[in-house]
Amino acid sequence: MSNVSEERRKRQQNIKEGLQFIQSPLSYPGTQEQYAVYLRALVRNLFNEGNDVYREHDWNNSISQYTEALNIADYAKSEEILIPKEIIEKLYINRIACYSNMGFHDKVLEDCNIVLSLNASNCKALYRKSKALSDLGRYKKAYDAVAKCSLAVPQDEHVIKLTQELAQKLGFKIRKAYVRAELSLKSVPGDGATKALNHSVEDIEPDLLTPRQEAVPVVSLPAPSFSHEVGSELASVPVMPLTSILPLQVEESALPSAVLANGGKMPFTMPEAFLDDGDMVLGDELDDLLDSAPETNETVMPSALVRGPLQTASVSPSMPFSASLLGTLPIGARYAPPPSFSEFYPPLTSSLEDFCSSLNSFSMSESKRDLSTSTSREGTPLNNSNSSLLLMNGPGSLFASENFLGISSQPRNDFGNFFGSAVTKPSSSVTPRHPLEGTHELRQACQICFVKSGPKLMDFTYHANIDHKCKKDILIGRIKNVEDKSWKKIRPRPTKTNYEGPYYICKDVAAEEECRYSGHCTFAYCQEEIDVWTLERKGAFSREAFFGGNGKINLTVFKLLQEHLGEFIFLCEKCFDHKPRMISKRNKDNSTACSHPVTKHEFEDNKCLVHILRETTVKYSKIRSFHGQCQLDLCRHEVRYGCLREDECFYAHSLVELKVWIMQNETGISHDAIAQESKRYWQNLEANVPGAQVLGNQIMPGFLNMKIKFVCAQCLRNGQVIEPDKNRKYCSAKARHSWTKDRRAMRVMSIERKKWMNIRPLPTKKQMPLQFDLCNHIASGKKCQYVGNCSFAHSPEEREVWTYMKENGIQDMEQFYELWLKSQKNEKSEDIASQSNKENGKQIHMPTDYAEVTVDFHCWMCGKNCNSEKQWQGHISSEKHKEKVFHTEDDQYCWQHRFPTGYFSICDRYMNGTCPEGNSCKFAHGNAELHEWEERRDALKMKLNKARKDHLIGPNDNDFGKYSFLFKDLN
C-alpha cells in the first residue's frame, strides 16, 4: 500500500488544481477577499507539502515546493493580495535549509540576505549564513553573523558549537557563558516558552496552520437539494465528545464546528495546550491528554439509519456550507482546508443525487465494516467505527466535474470515503515492483518475443501477444510519456570496472553507428540502460527481485573486496580529518596511541574504518558509521567536486562506503567485524592462491610464460635496474630508497624475446576496453607523445599482462606478482621461499626494520603521500596538482562548449553574424554557451572551495593559469 496519507494525497491534488486555475485566464467567481483566502491557502499547502518532502530528505523536490509558494506570493502581490511577511520569511528559511543540506552556499547566502532584509534578527537566517560563510572560508564574516545569533539564542547547542569553531579558527579566546539560575516551576504542557527551547536553529519552520479569520462565507450559487430524510435520520446519530476519539492530531486552525446532518453544531472542545502543535504530543503532554479522555463506548448506528427512497428537498438553512466544512476530512486525520473550489461552491446536484440514490442499498451490516478506516498523516489506519461523529466531505473540487471548464472526467463521489458499500471502488493501490515504476516500463522477455527486426544494433521488436512459453531471461524497458515507444534491451551492468561516476551513452551508438565492441561495450546503449544500471550499482534495484527471486543483495566483506579490491583497516580519525589529511595507524610500540610522531591521539577513541586501494595511486575511502538518517545513495556533490558537509552529509561519499552501509543495514555487521573479515580475506589469499573461495573464480590455466621481478622505480628513472635488499625494506642502491608499493616497478621478460620490459599498472579508466591494443606511436617505432598515462600498451608483454589481469579481475600489480610466484612454486620452491618470505632464515634485524611507516600529508585528489612539509609544498604548487584540482575525467562528457574565458556575456558581433574570431573570441557565442559557462564556473568554484578547505592549495597561491578568473569573485 502507498505510504502517502489521504490528507496529503488530497493536499497534492488541491495544489495541482490550484496551480492549473491560476495559470488559466479565467476570472475568479468569488469576491476579492475570497480570492485572497484561496491564494493564501494554496501557499500554505505548498509550504506544508515542502515540509513533508523535506522530512523525506528529498531536498530538490522540497525546494520546488517552497519556490512555487514564493512565486505565487509574488503573483498575489501583483493581484493586490498580501501574503503575510511571516510566511514569506518562513518559506525562505526552509528553502535555505534545503540549499544548506545540498551544499549550495551561494544560494544560502542569497536567501539569507533576503530574510535578513525582512527581519534583521532572524536567528535561523543568521546561523545558516554563518555556516555557509564558514564553509566558504570567510571566517570573520561568519563569526560576525553567528555572534548576533548567539546573543538571541545563547543556549542553542548548534550555535555554541559553530561559535567555538569559528573562534578557534580566528584565534579568539573562548569564554565560558554565564547561565542564569531558573525557578523550578512546573511547566505547563504546550507552554510557549518550553516549546521554544525545543526548537533548534537547524530545524525548519513547522507546518503553517489555518488562521481563524479565513473562514470566509462561500460564493452564493444555486444550492443542491438534500433529503429531509437524510437530515432527520442522521440526526439520530449520537454524538460523542471530540476528546473521546484518540489519538488525534488537531491543528490550531479555523476549527469548524462539527456540523451534523440536521444542521446542528457541536463545538470542538479541546484544551488550548494541545492546539499548539499536532505533531509533537510527547511525555507529560501525552499523559495529560490521555487523562482528559473519557472512556469510549462502542456506539452502534441504528439499523434504521437509511430506509426507503430518498425525496429531495432544499438544504436546511441551519446547515451552513462554509469553506471549513466543505474541505473537512474524517476527524481521525489532521487536516487544513485545501485551496480547492469545493471551498467556495456547494456540492454539485448530480453528485448528491448519485449519493442519495446509492443510499437505497446501504445496509447496517455493511456500514459498520465500511466506516472503519481513514488515514492519518503518517499513513496509519485509524479506526473510526467507534465514533459516531460523522463529518461530510464535499464531492471534490470543480475540476473533477465534467461540466466545468470543459474538462471531461468521471464524476467523483467523495462520500464513498464514508459509505464504502454505497459506491464500490476497486483498490488501485499496488505495491511498486521497482523504483522506476513511475517513469519507466520494465518487462521480462525472451528471444522468441523480443526479436531482431533490422540491421542496426537497437533494432528490436517486442511481440507482447505472441503465444509461447516465455523464458523471461531478458530485461527490456522503455520510458513513459516519450515519443519513442520502442522497447530496448537492458544488458547486465558491467561490474569488472570499479567506476563510480555517471554512465554515458556509447559514442558509436550516439552517432547512429555500429558499436565496435557490440554486446560487450561497457558504455550504455540507451537511457533506459543508464537508469537501471545506476540504481543497480546503488543497490536500489535487483533483477533477481524483478524476475521473481527474493531480491536480497547478500553482500559480504569477501564479495566487497573481490569487487573493489584493497583492504579495510582502522586509522586515526583525528589525523585523517586533519587539514591537510594525515595517515596514522595504531602505534606498534604503544597500542593505545596512533603512530603520528608528534601528536599521539588515543587510538581506540578516535579510530575510523578506512578502505585503502593501492594502484598507481593510493586511495583512502573513509567508512562512516551507518545510522538511521543515512541515505543509501551516493552524494552527487562528492562525485562532482567534493562534498563540503563532509561527515555531516547523510549520503555515501564513495561506492565502497555505500556498499558497506547496505551490508550493515541488512546484516548489522560492525566495523570491527569488517576489519577482521578483511584481514582474514588477505590471509586466505596468501595461504591459498588461487583459491576459488577467495577470488570467486579459478585462475586461468597456463600462467603467462614470463619471468617477473620488481625493481626500484626511482632508480629506474635514472636508468638503473636495482632490486631490493634481502630484507626487502630498501633498494640495494646507495640511496637506499624505501621499498614500498608506490616506489617499485614491475619488469617482465618473455621467453621468446629474451628482453626485460617495463610494465605499467593496469589503466584505471572508467570503461575497460574489450581488448588492449598497442600504442600507435610505439608500433611505428616512435616515442609515445601522449601527455599523461597512455591507456594503450607500450609492448607486447605489457599487452599480455594487462589482458591477463583484466580477464581474471586482478587490479593490483602486487597481487599479480604473488599469483605468478605461486604458479612457479613447484618448479622453484627454494627461490620462492626466499622471495616471498621477507624474513626467512637467520638474519640480523636492525631497529630500522621495524620503523613505523607514517605519512605526514596525503593528497586525496592525486592519491599522493608526502613525508615532509617541503615535499608537500612542492606537490601542491605543482602544475599537475593544480590541474587535478579543477579537472575530472567526466569533463569531456559533461560540457559541450568551449572552456570559459572569464568574460561572461554574449558576443554582440556573433549575434549579428559578423564575429571573425571564432573560437578565439573571449565572449560567449550564444545563450547556450553562456549558460554552460556560468554553470561550469559554479562547479569550478565549488571544487576550488573544497580544495581550499582541505588545504590542498597554498593560502597565497593565486596562479592557476586559465582558472585564475575564479579568484575575481571569491574575494
UniProtKB/Swiss-Prot annotation:
Start and end residues, zinc fingers (C3H1-type): 634-656, 769-797, 906-928
Entry GO CC: nucleus
Any one GO molecular-function label of the UniProt entry: RNA binding
Post-translational modification Phosphothreonine, affected residues: 210
GO biological process: miRNA processing; post-transcriptional regulation of gene expression
PROSITE patterns xrefs: ZF_C3H1 (PS50103), ZINC_FINGER_C2H2_1 (PS00028)
Residue ranges covered by zinc fingers (C2H2-type): 857-881
Taxonomy, superkingdom: Eukaryota
Keywords: Coiled coil, Metal-binding, Nucleus, Phosphoprotein, Repeat, RNA-binding, TPR repeat, Zinc, Zinc-finger
Coiled-coil portions: 924-952
Family matches, as InterPro entries: TPR-like_helical_dom_sf, ZC3H7A/B, Znf_C2H2_sf, Znf_CCCH, Znf_CCCH_sf
First and last residues of every TPR repeat: 43-76, 89-122, 124-156
One Pfam family here: zf-CCCH
SMART domains cross-referenced by the UniProt entry: ZnF_C3H1
Localization of this protein: Nucleus
Function: May be a specific regulator of miRNA biogenesis. Binds to microRNAs MIR7-1, MIR16-2 and MIR29A hairpins recognizing the 3'-ATA(A/T)-5' motif in the apical loop.
Name under which the protein is recorded: Zinc finger CCCH domain-containing protein 7A
